[in-house]
Structures are given as structure tokens and as C-alpha cells.
Amino acid sequence: MELVAKRFNELSLDEYHELLKLRCAVFLAEQQSPYQEVDDADKEAIHLYFRNDEGALAAYARVLPAGVTHPTASIGRVIAVERGCGMGRRIMEEAIRVAQQELNADVITIE
């Protein structure tokens, strides 16, 4: 597994498109979420994702600085492609680590 952490301006168009496809498949199609999937918060986020050994997306999370969607740093859009194998836990652990180390977060809101 490879962990990738990129800010919006570091993502290629292909990477961002792939992340949006995954998010839409899970949150809009599968979970029928009524919330807008593409928003301006993406531009402020650190996008974290795991790729498996074949290069496919295995997990994703979006980490936001304080003041973007909440008064505190926040973690949202969490996806584990394969469920029941610990990827959700791994991506959350990494998201918390990034929020603490990169954003100096003492308090983190989970969306």
C-alpha cells in the first residue's frame, strides 16, 4: 500500500477526477447523500489516499484546516473501498496524524 498526501494544487487533473469518481460512487450513488459532493473546501484540503499494489484506490479521506467547514480542523469524505479489512482504520489514523502534524490541530471534528 502506498499512502499519498496532496494539497489541491498538487493533484493532477487525472488524480482529482479519479478521487471525485470514487466519492460520487460512494456518497451520491451508494449512500444517496443529499449534500453537494464537489465544493470549494476541496481547494483548502489535504487529500489523503491509499493505492493498493495494483495502483487502484483503496481508501480516501479529506483533511481540512480550521475555519474551512468547522471552527476546528476536520476530517471527512472518508472511504474504504474494500470494507472489513482495516482500511477505514488506517486512513483515519493517517488523517488524524496529518491534521495534528501538518495543521497543528489539537481538536479535530469528524464529519
How does the language model describe each region?
Residues 1, 71, 106:
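Residue-level signal for beta-strand positions within conserved beta-sheet cores that form or flank
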Residues 30, 66-68:
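Conserved, charge-rich beta-strand/loop surface module that forms ligand/interface-binding patches
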Residues 99-111:
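Conserved GNAT acetyl-CoA-binding A-motif
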